[in-house]
A protein has these predicted regions:
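An edge-strand/N-cap motif at the start of beta-rich repeat modules
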Residues: 48-78
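Short, exposed coil/turn segments at beta-strand boundaries within extracellular/luminal domains
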Residues: 36-44
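Hydrophobic/tyrosine-rich beta-strand signature of extracellular beta-sandwich/beta-rich modules
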Residues: 29-33
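Repeat-based blade/solenoid architectures
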Residues: 96-101, 250-256, 306-312, 354-362, ...
Length: 422
């Protein structure tokens, strides 16, 4: 007996048991039988074998349990019972993630092959989107220039358009990451030159948030209370040409820490909305529309929220399909801001959803089609897998699905899409 897969012999037994560990794709297979008494007489059958990865398409959740990050996966293909595969990074790579969970994302298939990125405070991991095997590791050994320490408070590498990203270290410095580079670019200068005035240097203390664009990034400085747009002048000698060596400081004073941002639509084009909140003073503000450089669009773009329900631990998300901004009150209650309301008469409308009393919202993620909102909650169950995820209707809050014990405390989620060879 002989079995072949793409012309490669894989077995010589009557019954075949074979694990495909290469690519999930369509293979050409052949089973061949040779009569023992006459080697010249052979029987064979050719057929196709379609191999799918168990991680082809579904929900990827990054959660945290007592500073132990973990990745869980739930397939949305032929999974009627919503079976959840937990700790899939450790399962496929035979080692555990370290640090504090920060973010998980998947790149665009056509420009970056659908690569999955997992970010923690200790390291960033580039994973094969089919096998979840680690392709690249970015840690303290992945810097172009010297780094004071590797302990990130924010990190995202991938943007579907720009393929550019970066991280903020505990040292308050930005470490850019360019697509397909196996390292971080040189860290941003601190203090840094002001655009148009090479003699002026300013210090900064960033909120743990970035809006990355091509060869630049938008940060928010808690010292000046303004957006700072980090760029490279190409005039100041550095370790590499991508080092951020100058900033453009926004003219608009906000004076509150940056909580988060999201894309919204206006006239068929994307713009950005940002939420600001200071838990010490309990003051909040909304930048309804601004550019990727931090410039506010329109005189009424900055609104200080008097009737807000933000609190320490609040999370937010923007639905670009209906231009709503969702945020939590630090507990189980959701609120919505209508970014398209011209008068903005109702800045905080309760968004009712029948979540249980014994939970705290820790994650909000709008679905790719903008029709649903994934709500990650931490329950009071005395166990490791205390994190649940609810899929709710994006307009009325109706619970569509409940994924119980998805992981630890939910931090970030991505709707993993299949790639061409899966």
């Amino acid at each position: 007996y002989a079995w072949y897969l793409d012309q490669k012999k894989i077995a010589e037994t009557e019954d075949l048991c074979y694990v495909v560990s290469d690519k999930a794709k369509k293979y050409q297979a052949r089973m061949e039988v040779t009569l023992p008494e006459d080697d010249s007489v052979r029987f064979f059958a050719d057929f196709e074998v379609q191999v799918f990865s168990p991680y082809s398409k579904g929900l990827l959740l990054l959660s945290d349990y007592e500073d132990y990050p973990e990745v869980s996966f739930m397939s949305t293909l032929n999974n009627p019972t919503n079976k959840i595969m937990r700790d899939v990074y450790s399962l496929e790579n035979k080692r555990e993630l370290k640090g504090k969970a920060l973010a998980i994302e998947q790149s665009d298939e056509y420009s970056y092959g659908g690569t999955v990125f997992v970010h923690t405070s200790a390291s960033s991991h580039e994973l094969d989107p089919v096998l979840f095997k680690e392709i690249a590791l970015f840690d303290e050994n992945s810097f172009t220039g010297p780094a004071q320490e590797y302990d990130m408070v924010y990190c995202r590498f991938e943007d579907a358009i720009t393929e550019f990203g970066g991280a903020i270290g505990k040292d308050g410095i930005i470490y850019p990451k360019q697509a397909r580079q196996s390292r971080y670019m040189a860290s941003s200068l601190k203090p840094i030159h002001v655009e148009g005035d090479e003699e002026r240097l300013v210090d900064y203390r960033l909120s743990p948030m970035l809006l990355n664009t091509r060869n630049s990034t938008l940060g928010y400085d808690n010292l000046s209370g303004r957006f700072m747009y980090f760029m490279n002048s190409y005039d100041i000698p550095s370790y590499d040409e991508n080092q951020y060596d100058e900033v453009r400081i926004s003219e608009t004073y906000i004076g509150l820490p940056w909580l988060g941002w999201g894309k919204n639509m206006s006239g068929g084009t994307y713009q950005f909305s940002s939420l600001f909140y200071d838990p010490v003073t309990d003051r909040a503000a909304l930048a309804r529309a601004h550019t990727a450089t931090g410039k506010l669009k329109g005189q009424d773009s900055l609104v200080f929220l008097s009737g807000h329900h933000l609190a320490e631990g609040s999370v937010m998300a923007v639905n670009s399909g209906i231009n709503w901004l969702y945020y939590s009150d630090g507990g189980r209650q959701l609120y919505v801001l209508n970014l398209s309301d011209p008068d903005f008469k109702f800045p905080s409308i309760p968004f009712e959803c029948a979540l249980p009393d014994n939970c705290r919202i820790t994650m909000l993620k709008v679905s790719v089609d903008n029709l649903a909102l994934f709500v990650g909650v931490e329950t009071d169950r005395p166990e490791k897998y205390k994190g649940d995820v609810y899929k709710i209707n994006a307009k009325d809050g109706t619970i569509l699905e409940h994924y119980q014990r998805f992981g630890g405390t939910p931090v970030d989620m991505v709707e993993k899409k299949s790639v061409e060879y899966d």
